[in-house]
Amino acid sequence: MAGHSKWANIQHRKGKQDKLRSKMFSKLAKEITVAAKMGDPDPDKNPRLRLAVKAAKAVSMPKDVIERAIKKSQGGDAEDYSEIRYEGYGPNGIAIIVETMTDNVNRTASNVRSYFTKYGGNLGTTGSVSFMFDRVGEITYKPAAGDADTVMMAAIEAGADDVESDEEGHWIYCGDTSLNEVSEALEKVLGESEEAKLVWKPQNRTNVDLETAQKLMKLIDALEEDDDVQTVTGNFDIPEDVAAKLDA
């Protein structure tokens, strides 16, 4: 599968999202604050903020926490964050992109490098792996939104480029600059999406064995547990039989 990755679902099944819930909230709040500070504090007038708020609602972040994050952006004490992308290779040459938002670039660079080194990878330079990914918009719907044909037709009408559907849902892809436009068009036909965000979509994925999957999960867990890291993306997939052993 070229786009949607099953390992995200594996993380859900392992209960990882519950463990990282508070950390996830703080990262989403940071994105909301930065988006609001860079543009208008009204989500309807600020596409990036609208997506950030949508992502927060998707994981049931309380409304007052969202509003507090927006309000923080308008105060003089809002931190200045730098958005830095790191690229490297994990175990067995799997390409990994790490997006960070930090108030201390030296600290973040040192930490990210140490995670790669500790878990069998190596940090590269900017551009060393991103050419193997496409920067696109990803809009997610649950299976109840409709069958594959219905969603495909709606996506084409909305201006999307690609759709992937399976028993777990629908993933609709579009150009990175047209995410809000396509998302709004889809909502008129399919209702509100579960999630809409910019992602790094691998052009190709490598199926990994159990040993590699275990090593990759350790690296990804370490990265995602760092407060400065916002997203981690790899060009791999975990076959169902390997996933079952990971869950065991």
Curated annotation (Swiss-Prot):
- At the top level, the lineage of the source is Bacteria
Q: Does the keyword Transcription regulation apply?
A: yes
User: GO MF annotations for this entry?
Assistant: DNA binding
Q: Which GO terms describe its cellular component?
A: cytosol
BP GO annotations:
regulation of DNA-templated transcription
Q: Where in or outside the cell is it found? A: Cytoplasm
What keywords does the record list, in alphabetical order? Cytoplasm, DNA-binding, Transcription, Transcription regulation
For this protein, the record's Gene3D superfamilies field holds: 1.10.10.200, 3.30.70.980
Under Pfam families, the record lists: TACO1_YebC_N, Transcrip_reg
**InterPro entries linked to this entry:** Integrase-like_N, TACO1_YebC-like_2nd/3rd_dom, TACO1_YebC_N, Transcrip_reg_TACO1-like, Transcrip_reg_TACO1-like_dom3, YebC-like
The record's region (Disordered) falls at 1-21
Family statement drawn from the similarity comment of this UniProt entry: Belongs to the TACO1 family.
Instruction: From the Swiss-Prot or TrEMBL record, give the protein name.
Output: Probable transcriptional regulatory protein RHOS4_22610
